[in-house]
Amino acid sequence: VSRQIIGKYEAATRVPQRDKAAAMDEALATGDALTLLWEQIMDDAHVPPEFRNALMMERRSKHIREYHAILVPGLLQTPDYAITLVRARRVNGPPESIDQVVQTRVERLQKLSDMRPLLWFVVEWVALTRVVGDEKIMREQRRHLIDLMEGGTIQLQVIEDSRHNPGLCGAYRVMSLHDGRTVGFVEDPLGGRSVTKREEIDYLSTLFGMLQSEALSPRSTLERLKELDHA
């Protein structure tokens, strides 16, 4: 690879082929770091820009804590649940772009399986009961959550009584990374923003602990999900 081409790679004005990334890994003795980065960039090509950084941090996490007030968190969504939401928000998007966004969303959990981070979620009761799409989609979504909990993939807690809980805010997550850093991501109607200030991270972490204290235990949450499943 010429010096000029490498300069274009470094300036992000040209994307290398996968074999070039692998060759640079070998030349620089970087293991497969550049190849993995290439795969992440290509996988994320259809992800809205405001979510790309959060997605990269997600893949470097050893512990993810997430709260959602009205929806099932994206990491846990079934394809039908996800496509219903994406279609509702991307009304002007071509069908192929919607399919790509949905595929990226539902593959997120699978891409974390090798690293096995601790995944802990707190959601409001309405996230499990409000109908997204139709009743069949919701039954399949709740069954998916049951399978993830019984398989030990996630810990999930539900807040049944929302009158006095400290949440009632937008969705957010706190991610503890393998390099020792902790970062956050707060969602809003335009996408969201990353959080890196220590005092803001501390606030989000404390708030998550307060939400956990108001929620049912994971075991009780699983029992409530099964009751809904058989209702």
Tell what function each PLM region has.
Residues 1-42:
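Basic, Lys/Arg-rich alpha-helical nucleic-acid-recognition elements, primarily the DNA-binding modules
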Residues 1-2, 50-51, 122-125:
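A short alpha-helix capping/helix-coil boundary motif
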Residues 10, 58, 187:
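Acidic-residue sensor for enzyme active/binding pockets
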Residues 31, 37, 41-44, 211, ...:
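Short, leucine/isoleucine-rich alpha-helical interaction segments at C-terminal helix-coil junctions
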Residues 63, 67-231:
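Hydrophobic protein-protein interaction segments
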